[in-house]
């Protein structure tokens, strides 16, 4: 690749004595795996910048699945994430690593990701709003076209006074059943607008995204979620991403 692309490191691991194997999220090519030769060496100027949450410009070469990183330059300092915001950022990175197709462009999602990190870095409260908005944006970019505004059974507009039950690959059906898969019309209208004016709609958004993401994640638990539970003090309700 001759030109530069904007990118973030999603995950990195040592490779040989001096190199790094990196998963990148790039603006034009989506998720890429690159080998950063010599990046762990004493004289490498890449050590400090090949870290998660640092906006980068990168170039690579190669024709196989694993490319060779040729250049990387930080666009700015790493976004300052700490505490629950740091674990939330790691959760978002793990989601992208798990669900994105390799070398498939998600240019709109790249900016949703950047906005999510900026929201986390600028927040002094809960990460919940930023995470739920990003999850819904990611599902939309994956082609998970859930219609929150119409009943899948009748085609009628969702009523804020009724209850609807989610059915995978179909959508929301009007129902008298109230269980884990049930949502009020008011909650669905909030999800459609990606707005969470109160704790009830925020909890509903979290419940829906966990249901919707489950087929993508399979039975393998998210490591970042377990780390959050281990190292961040929990209130009575589950605060993990």
Curated annotation (Swiss-Prot):
GO biological process, alphabetically ordered: DNA recombination; double-strand break repair
Pfam families xref list: RecO_C, RecO_N
InterPro entries according to UniProt: ARFGAP/RecO (IPR037278), DNA_rep/recomb_RecO_N (IPR022572), NA-bd_OB-fold (IPR012340), RecO (IPR003717), RecO_C (IPR042242)
Keyword DNA repair appears in the UniProt entry: yes
Alphabetic keyword roster: DNA damage, DNA recombination, DNA repair
Domain of life: Bacteria
Gene Ontology cellular component annotations, sorted alphabetically: bacterial nucleoid
The keyword 4Fe-4S is assigned to this record: no
Family that this chain belongs to: Belongs to the RecO family.
Function: Involved in DNA repair and RecF pathway recombination.
This protein's name: DNA repair protein RecO
Species for this entry: Yersinia pestis
Gene this protein is translated from: recO
